[in-house]
Amino acid sequence: MARAVHRSGLVALGIATALMASCAFAAKDVVVAVGSNFTTLDPYDANDTLSQAVAKSFYQGLFGLDKEMKLKNVLAESYTVSDDGITYTVKLREGIKFQDGTDFNAAAVKANLDRASDPANHLKRYNLYKNIAKTEAIDPTTVKITLKQPFSAFINILAHPATAMISPAALEKYGKEIGFHPVGTGPYELDTWNQTDFVKVKKFAGYWQPGLPKLDSITWRPVADNNTRAAMLQTGEAQFAFPIPYEQAALLEKNKNIELMASPSIMQRYISMNVTQKPFDNPKVREALNYAINRPALVKVAFAGYATPATGVVPPSIAYAQSYKPWPYDPVKARELLKEAGYPNGFSTTLWSSHNHSTAQKVLQFTQQQLAQVGIKAQVTAMDAGQRAAEVEGKGQKESGVRMFYTGWSASTGEADWALSPLFASQNWPPTLFNTAFYSNKQVDDFLAQALKTNDPAEKTRLYKAAQDIIWQESPWIPLVVEKLVSAHSKNLTGFWIMPDTGFSFEDADLQ
């Protein structure tokens, strides 16, 4: 009898194991290998695109941007703007719940915009919302937002990934810890966040769009090494990987189970120079460094051809971008300018990077070698997200150790103000925003401010051109390249792609 029971138990165990294996196989679980870690899951307090991209798992905004960076309605149904450009009235969708069961309504919008526009909260994205004078809940589905002054790009601010609707109940419950406890209206809710290893999100059963999401879970896994990221895709450890190491693109393209995608981008890579510090306060030094870098060679060496040399300080696909004659590679001219500037034997400096993945390392090494050829000794440091937040984003001009800084920017609003003001306006030095050159020019400030007060395209073109002309001439940057976005995914994964600003779109993602 005992032997018979034992056999029955084995059979039952075998059936149970088979069923569990079947269920596990049937579960639609996707692993996404990304290039760096996340700083926070509070979109209003994140300066990096990746953290905001992952936060889209939980959160949605009133508006969003599609693949072509065109405005689309999300939690809002429509909007109107007053003739004076001061008041925006937004009509909301009805019947939407936050993941904690509370209602999304006009009061929730007010709570979020009040928080975002209050400087006392010290949120990293405050500058996006500082022009809001007040937000009113007219009725449960109507919000009126009054600005301090006309701001023609404001609707694009509401479409920015930072402008997420967080549950007011969660804001009250978690306070400053909301970055660890995301609660939104999005398709997924938080399962686990291991801060050194991964963020796992699971399907939100109460999501308001019928039939979505189609995946059961997404695990966002930071993998700094490019080759490891590609290998995870080939072994099936990951179903989506971005960025793909450019040198491995051709190899992955040959894999019958993998689809490679090279997408258009608004991601500009550049090196800022701290113009408040010697020797970068000398325009001739900045000009010399621009001549010292062979951009076409950089495209080949670090990006395997998946980039184009920069022809301005705003990527060409952004409205009102101006293009200029690219800086030629001329090390002889660079040495002449350094001599004229009082540095005939060059100088020593530091070159930091905002990322530590393999492509960033290649850019650092290439730039270090190029600078050495004109007598400049650059000590390079590739930072992770935590180092960047502490040493670059968190320190003002007097405390900052930034000298040369390799980084990138994508104007996630899809318009020119967000491509220029955060990076060049005098009021946007760190820790306020990302003007890591500590650049300041009153004319540029005035042109950028005036451009926000007009809706006339011709006048905006004139003003943005004038600002870019000055910036290009004064050269607080070494503009390098505009990237192409190379990602890869398992062929059985659909509806998962990279946005031009390097964010992710995955609302319709499915695993066949």
UniProtKB/Swiss-Prot annotation:
Cystine residue pairs: none
Gene assigned in the entry: gsiB
Keywords attached to this entry: Periplasm, Signal, Transport
One GO cellular component term: outer membrane-bounded periplasmic space
Gene Ontology MF: a single term: peptide transmembrane transporter activity
Compartments, as annotated in UniProt: Periplasm
GO BP terms in the entry: dipeptide transport
Function, as annotated: Part of the ABC transporter complex GsiABCD involved in glutathione import. Binds glutathione.
Keyword Signal annotated: yes
Record-given protein name: Glutathione-binding protein GsiB
One Pfam family linked to the record: SBP_bac_5
PANTHER family xref list: GLUTATHIONE-BINDING PROTEIN GSIB, PERIPLASMIC BINDING COMPONENT OF ABC TRANSPORTER
Signal peptide: 1-26
Subunit composition and interactions: The complex is composed of two ATP-binding proteins (GsiA), two transmembrane proteins (GsiC and GsiD) and a solute-binding protein (GsiB).
Chief place where the protein resides: periplasm
Family classification: Belongs to the bacterial solute-binding protein 5 family.
Source species, domain of life: Bacteria
